Amino acid sequence: MGGYSYGEATNSTELGGLVAKILFYDIETAPNLAYVWGQYDQNVVKQYREWYLLCFSYKWEGQKTTKVVSLPDFPEVYSEDPENDIAVVGALWKLFDEADVVVGHNGDRFDMRKANARFAFHDLKPPTMPMQIDTLKVARKYFMFNSNKLGDLGQHLGLGNKEATGGFELWAGCMRGDEKSWRGMKKYAKQDVDLL
């Protein structure tokens, strides 16, 4: 965050003589779908479909390139069921299992808990639990920025802003299988990790 460096390595960092593999990551999910009787102040009558992972972006400390893993990256699974996130979840599980430290913005409250929920759903044993650094918590605890939103922090610290999405339509387009939407989602997800 903001020019703070953890050292130079290909995918690990030396901390007091120990080598730590540090993973920066972010996930994007599809929304829950439900039946409702109205638009405002409504209870869900029945849930139609639960959320799932659309994609995740990641970069190892010391690497320049941020990668994105998404549902269409697994065409055999995706063509059979475009909502089946088993391959994406499995790829994320492997990274978590390899990492000593994971870094995400609001990762403790959202990304890690959502990831753990999908690991459990797919009967994956918990990965070797890495140490977590939540940059939102770090910003709140050690600094007094006007805003702790990732895009605002990135802009304030000269790292850039979040990628514009155009709103919910980007997520809806991905759920419909629209290739342009998937390109936009990957660009959006990549930028979130680049801001970390």
Positions of predicted regions on the chain:
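Conserved RNase H-like, two-metal-ion catalytic cores of nucleic-acid enzymes
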Residues: Y4, N11-D97
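Short, motif-level signal for alpha-helix interfacial/capping segments enriched in acidic residues
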Residues: Y4-G7, F110-R113, L170-W171
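Acidic, Mg2+-coordinating catalytic module of metal-dependent nucleases/exonucleases
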Residues: V103, K149-L196
